[in-house]
C-alpha cells in the first residue's frame, strides 16, 4: 500500500474524511482535493488532540480562508514535534510529498503517544478551554474534567482511535443540534467535551447526546467497520457499515409497526364506539389506518426474512420493489384522507382530547393523536434516507445494488406524489367547505365526489391570453373557479356539462406540451394548459372515461389538427341534454348533410311537402326560420319499402331537387351575410359553418395606427368578433363602475362643501352677533 492510500484509509478510519462510494483511481489527486481547504486537517487535529483548534472555517470560500485552516492545523502539529510543511505546498499542490510526510509523522506520533498520554495534559486543555468560556466555574470544571478525562483516556485506549459507545437509555432531542438515540444504538463519538455532553454520529446524522446515557463497547463487541481498524491494516478504501445500517432499518421498522399497532388498539378502535363523533366523522378520522398498520407488519416480516440470508444474498431492495404497488395504494389513500382527518380533529378537538386522556394518554391528549396520525408521512420520508445510507455502504457488485437504487427513486417519487395529493385534497376541502363567490345553480356539495382537481391555465376561443383557473371534475359536470384577488376565496367562472363535450389532445403540436382543448354543443372552445404531464394524463384519462360512459355522447379525439368545427358559445347555465334525446354526433360539414332523410311513416311524406312549401315562403322573410328547421332535421331515420316507392315518384324527386337547390343557395349566401351583415347576433353562433377553405378579407387597425388587410377564415372571424364583443362589454362595465364612483365622489364632495359653507356661515353670524353686543 503506497503512502497516499495509507493516508486515505487512516483519515476514513478516524471519521474525518467521508468514505467514497466508488473505488479511488488516483489517491493522490483525491487527497489533494480533499485536503486543499484545510477543513479535514482541522477535524483531524481536533480528533487526535481535542481542543487544539477552537474555531475554523467549515465552508471556506476564499484562498485566505483555506490558508488559515491549514495554519491552524500546523499549529496543532507543532506540539507533536513533527516536521511540518508550508501551507502553499498543500494549497498549490506543488510539493505534496512534504504534506504526506507530515501526515505520516503525525500518525506515527499519535500512535506512539496514545498509551502514554497523561491525563493532566488533556484535562488542562479542557480546563483552559472552559475557563475561557466560563471563568467563574473554571476551578470546579477543572476538577470534574480531571475525573472524567481519565475515564475517557481509558475508553480511547481500547485498541482504536475511534471511541464507540452503546446507548443504555432512550434519549429524545430537544434542540436541532442534539442527537436522538434509542436503547441499544451504536454511536461513533466524534467529539468529547466537558459538561456531560458528547458529539457522535448515528445513521449518518451527527449531534450531541448525554455521556452518562451510553457505555463503552469492548473490542469484541464492535462491528466490523473502518473506524474499528487500527493503523493501516485494512486495504480497501470503501469499507462500510452495511450490517449495522441494515439492522437499524429492521429495528426502526419494528418500532414503527409497534407504534401503529399500539395507537390502533389503545385509541382508534375504542374511538369507534364513542358517541361524540358520528360514523362519518370516525371513518374520516381513521381512513385506512388499519390497513396501513397491517401492511407495515407484513413489510417488517418480509424484511426480517431477507436479513436471514447471507449478506451477499440480501434482497432488501427487491423486497421493497415487489411491495411498492401496495405502498402506493396504501399511502396515497392515506394521504388523500388526511385533510379530512385533520378537519375532524380541528372541529372536535375538545372531545377528542378528553377521550385520549380518559384512555390514558398524557396531556394534551389531542397532540398525541395528531402526532401519531402523521407518523406514516414521517416514516415515508425516512425510507429514502435509510436506503441511501444502505446503498452508500454497499458494494457496486452486490446483487441488490441496482434494486436499492430503483427503490430510492420509487420512494422519492411516491413521497412527491403524496405531498402533492395532500395539498390538492386540502385545497379541495377548503373549496367545498367555504362559500364560493358568484356561485350559480345547486350547491356544490350536491354534485357528488370530486373525481379530479388541479390548477391549470386556460384560453377562451381565439384569445391568446392565458388565465389561471381551478378545474374540479364531478361525474356530470366540470366546474371552473378562479382565486380571488387577495387569495382569500374562490370565484365561480362557469360549469361545463360532460355530456356533449369533445376533448382533443394538442400535445402533438410543437409548443403545446400538456395541452388539450374542450369543445361541444354548449361549450365555447377552451384550451387547457396543464402544469405537468402527470396532471395532463390524469385529465385525459378521467374525461375520456366519463365521456365514453353510457350516459355520454362524445368520444375523445386524439387528432391534433386545428379543431374549429362545432364551436358554440360557453354558458355557465347551459344544461345537458335529456336522457331521451338522441345523441348528437359531430361530423364534418358538407352539402350532402342537407339532403332530407326519409320520414318514418309513408303518410308523413305529404305533410312534409306541405311544410316545406310553407317554409320556403317564410324563408324569404326570415332566414332564421330556415336555420331552425335545419337544426331539427338532424335526427336520422330508417327508411322502409313503402317510403322507397313513394320517393321513387318523379314528382317527389323533382320537388326534392328544387328544395335542395334553395337550401344550398341559402347556405352559400351565408358567407356574404356574415361578412357584410349589420351586426353579430348576441348569444348564438351559426349552427351551420362553412368549410375553413372559404376566407374573408378583413381590414384591421393595429395599435400603432397602421391599417392592414388580412385574410381570415369564417370561423376565426366569428370568434374574433365574439372576443371583441366580450371585450367591449367588459370595457362598458368598467366605464359604468368608474362613472358610478365618479358620481359618488361628486355627491360626497357636494355634501362636504355644503357642510363647510354652513359652518362658515354660522361662524360669520356668531362673530357679527358678538360685535353687536359689544357696541354701546
UniProtKB/Swiss-Prot annotation:
Query: GO biological process: what's one of them?
Result: lamellipodium assembly
How is expression of this protein distributed across tissues?
A: Ubiquitous.
Q: Which residues form the DH domain?
A: 241-421
Q: Where is the composition biased (Polar residues)?
A: 121-151
Q: Taking every annotated instance into account, which residue ranges of this chain make up the domain PH?
A: 443-548
Q: Which keywords belong to this entry? A: Cell projection, Guanine-nucleotide releasing factor, Phosphoprotein, SH3 domain
Q: A Gene Ontology molecular-function term?
A: GTPase activator activity
Mark out the compositionally biased spans (Low complexity).
561-572
Q: Where is the SH3 domain?
A: 160-219
| InterPro entries reported for this sequence | AlphaPIX_SH3, CH_dom, CH_dom_sf, DBL_dom_sf, DH_dom, GEF6/7_CC, PH-like_dom_sf, PH_Cool_Pix
What is the recorded function of this protein according to its Swiss-Prot or TrEMBL entry? Acts as a RAC1 guanine nucleotide exchange factor (GEF).
Tell me the protein's name.
Answer: Rho guanine nucleotide exchange factor 6
**Species of origin:** Homo sapiens (Human)
The root-end lineage is: Eukaryota, Metazoa, Chordata, Craniata, Vertebrata
Gene responsible for this protein: ARHGEF6
Amino acid at each position: 500500500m503506497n503512502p497516499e492510500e495509507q493516508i486515505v484509509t487512516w483519515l476514513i478510519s478516524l471519521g474525518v474524511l467521508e468514505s467514497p462510494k466508488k473505488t479511488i483511481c488516483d489517491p493522490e489527486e483525491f487527497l489533494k482535493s480533499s485536503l486543499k481547504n484545510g477543513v479535514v486537517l482541522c477535524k483531524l487535529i481536533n480528533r487526535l488532540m481535542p481542543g487544539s483548534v477552537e474555531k475554523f472555517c467549515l465552508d471556506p470560500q476564499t484562498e485566505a480562508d483555506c490558508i488559515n485552516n491549514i495554519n491552524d492545523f500546523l499549529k496543532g502539529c507543532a506540539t507533536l514535534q513533527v516536521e511540518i510543511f508550508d501551507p502553499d505546498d498543500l494549497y498549490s499542490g506543488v510539493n505534496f510529498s512534504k504534506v504526506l510526510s507530515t501526515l505520516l509523522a503525525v500518525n506515527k506520533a499519535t500512535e506512539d503517544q496514545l498509551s502514554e498520554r497523561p491525563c493532566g495534559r488533556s484535562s488542562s486543555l479542557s480546563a483552559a478551554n472552559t475557563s475561557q468560556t466560563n471563568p467563574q466555574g473554571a476551578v470546579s470544571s477543572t476538577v470534574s474534567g480531571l475525573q472524567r478525562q481519565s475515564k475517557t483516556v481509558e475508553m480511547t485506549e481500547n485498541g482504536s482511535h475511534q471511541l464507540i459507545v452503546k446507548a443504555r437509555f432512550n434519549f429524545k432531542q430537544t434542540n436541532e443540534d442534539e442527537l436522538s438515540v434509542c436503547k441499544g444504538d451504536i454511536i461513533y463519538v466524534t467529539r468529547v467535551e466537558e459538561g456531560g455532553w458528547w458529539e457522535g454520529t448515528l445513521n449518518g446524522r451527527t449531534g450531541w447526546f448525554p455521556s452518562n446515557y451510553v457505555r463503552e463497547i469492548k473490542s469484541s463487541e464492535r462491528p466490523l467497520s473502518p473506524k474499528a481498524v487500527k493503523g493501516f491494516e485494512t486495504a480497501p478504501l470503501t469499507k462500510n457499515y452495511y450490517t449495522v445500517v441494515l439492522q437499524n432499518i429492521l429495528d426502526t421498522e419494528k418500532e414503527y409497526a409497534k407504534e401503529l399497532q399500539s395507537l390502533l388498539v389503545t385509541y382508534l378502535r375504542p374511538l369507534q364506539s364513542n358517541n361524540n363523533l358520528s360514523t362519518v366523522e370516525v371513518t374520516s378520522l381513521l381512513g385506512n389506518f388499519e390497513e396501513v398498520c397491517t401492511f407495515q407488519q407484513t413489510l417488517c416480516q418480509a424484511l426480517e426474512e431477507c436479513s436471514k440470508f447471507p449478506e451477499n444474498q440480501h434482497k432488501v431492495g427487491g423486497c421493497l420493489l415487489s411491495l411498492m404497488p401496495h405502498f402506493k395504494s396504501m399511502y396515497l389513500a392515506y394521504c388523500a384522507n388526511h385533510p379530512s382527518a385533520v378537519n375532524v380533529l380541528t372541529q372536535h378537538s375538545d372531545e377528542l382530547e378528553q377521550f385520549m386522556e380518559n384512555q390514558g394518554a398524557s396531556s394534551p391528549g389531542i397532540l398525541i393523536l395528531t402526532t401519531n396520525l402523521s407518523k406514516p408521512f414521517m416514516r415515508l420520508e425516512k425510507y429514502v434516507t435509510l436506503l441511501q445510507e444502505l446503498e452508500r455502504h454497499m458494494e457496486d457488485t452486490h446483487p441488490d445494488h441496482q434494486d436499492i437504487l430503483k427503490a430510492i427513486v420509487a420512494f422519492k417519487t411516491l413521497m412527491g406524489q403524496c405531498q402533492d395529493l395532500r395539498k390538492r385534497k386540502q385545497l379541495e376541502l377548503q373549496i367545498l367547505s367555504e362559500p364560493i363567490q358568484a356561485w350559480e345553480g345547486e350547491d356544490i356539495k350536491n354534485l357528488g365526489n370530486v373525481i379530479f382537481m388541479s390548477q391549470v391555465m386556460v384560453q377562451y376561443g381565439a384569445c391568446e391570453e392565458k388565465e389561471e383557473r381551478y378545474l374540479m371534475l364531478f361525474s356530470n359536470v366540470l366546474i371552473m373557479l378562479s382565486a380571488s384577488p387577495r387569495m382569500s376565496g374562490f370565484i365561480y367562472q362557469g360549469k361545463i356539462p360532460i355530456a356533449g363535450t369533445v376533448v382533443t389532445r394538442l400535445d402533438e403540436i410543437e409548443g403545446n406540451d400538456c395541452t388539450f382543448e374542450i369543445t361541444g354543443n354548449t361549450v365555447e372552445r377552451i384550451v387547457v394548459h396543464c402544469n405537468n404531464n402527470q396532471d395532463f394524463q390524469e385529465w385525459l384519462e378521467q374525461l375520456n372515461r366519463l365521456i365514453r360512459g353510457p350516459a355520454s355522447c362524445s368520444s375523445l379525439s386524439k387528432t391534433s389538427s386545428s379543431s374549429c368545427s362545432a364551436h358554440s358559445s360557453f354558458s355557465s347555465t347551459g344544461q345537458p341534454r335529456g336522457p331521451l334525446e338522441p345523441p348528437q354526433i359531430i361530423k364534418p360539414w358538407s352539402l350532402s348533410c342537407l339532403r332530407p332523410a326519409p320520414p318514418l311513416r309513408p303518410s308523413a311524406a305529404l305533410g312534409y311537402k306541405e311544410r316545406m312549401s310553407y317554409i320556403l315562403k317564410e324563408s324569404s322573410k326570415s332566414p332564421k326560420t330556415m336555420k331552425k328547421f335545419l337544426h331539427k332535421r338532424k335526427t336520422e331515420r330508417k327508411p322502409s319499402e313503402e317510403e322507397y316507392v313513394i320517393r321513387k315518384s318523379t314528382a317527389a324527386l323533382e320537388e326534392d331537387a328544387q328544395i335542395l337547390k334553395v337550401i344550398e343557395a341559402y347556405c352559400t349566401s351565408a358567407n356574404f351575410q356574415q361578412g357584410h351583415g349589420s351586426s353579430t347576433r348576441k348569444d348564438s353562433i351559426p349552427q351551420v359553418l362553412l368549410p375553413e377553405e372559404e376566407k374573408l378579407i378583413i381590414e384591421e387597425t393595429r395599435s400603432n395606427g397602421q391599417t392592414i388587410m388580412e385574410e381570415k377564415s369564417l370561423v376565426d372571424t366569428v370568434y374574433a368578433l365574439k372576443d371583441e364583443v366580450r371585450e367591449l362589454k367588459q370595457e362598458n362595465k368598467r366605464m359604468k363602475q368608474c362613472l358610478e364612483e365618479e358620481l359618488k365622489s361628486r355627491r360626497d364632495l357636494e355634501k362636504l362643501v355644503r357642510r363647510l359653507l354652513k359652518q362658515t356661515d354660522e361662524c360669520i353670524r356668531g362673530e357679527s352677533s358678538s360685535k353687536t353686543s359689544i357696541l354701546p
